Amino acid sequence: MKSKWNEETAEILIQQYENQGISKDLALRVYSCRLLGHDPSLVLHGGGNVSLKTSASDGLKGDQQVICVKGSGWDMGDIEPPGLPSMYLDQLLKLQSLTSLVDEDMVTYQRRSLLHPSSPNPSIETLLHAFLPHTYIDHTHAFLPHTYIDHTHAT
């Protein structure tokens, strides 16, 4: 697989978003998400998820550890910063000790964890991204594995 990353394009995006108050981390996450989303061998119908663990200011408590996860309904190839809503990471990590959680409660809790209440709904897979220790997570719905999985003779 050949990398499509371009430092010049990344720097232009960093500068463009910096003027809007968007951090370098988030600008680069937007860029990498778009690269994945534009590769039809990696992403079907704009689907998949990306996340970033970083810090962000909520305006009250100063910098907080957050996770930015692709919002539901956003196309990876056309993502903009609002499509990666920020949530308080410590709030989400509290859910790791639960033995069960119904979907409706999970969605409600994720919404309560948003830095900005008007943000879009984060992905239903947000907790998976939060519980994994990695700063950056890319999860795509690649075409080739699906062709094998969906084959009538797949076992």
Language model region names:
Residues M1-Q20:
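Generic N-terminal amphipathic, Lys/Arg-enriched alpha-helix
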Residues Q20-Y109, P122, L127, F131:
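N-terminal low-complexity or amphipathic/hydrophobic leaders
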Residues P85-S86, D150-T155:
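A glycine- and small-aliphatic-rich helix-loop capping segment at beta-alpha/alpha-beta transitions
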Residues R111-S119:
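Flexible, glycine/proline-enriched loop segments at strand-loop-helix junctions
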Residues T135-D150:
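Histidine-centered catalytic micro-motifs
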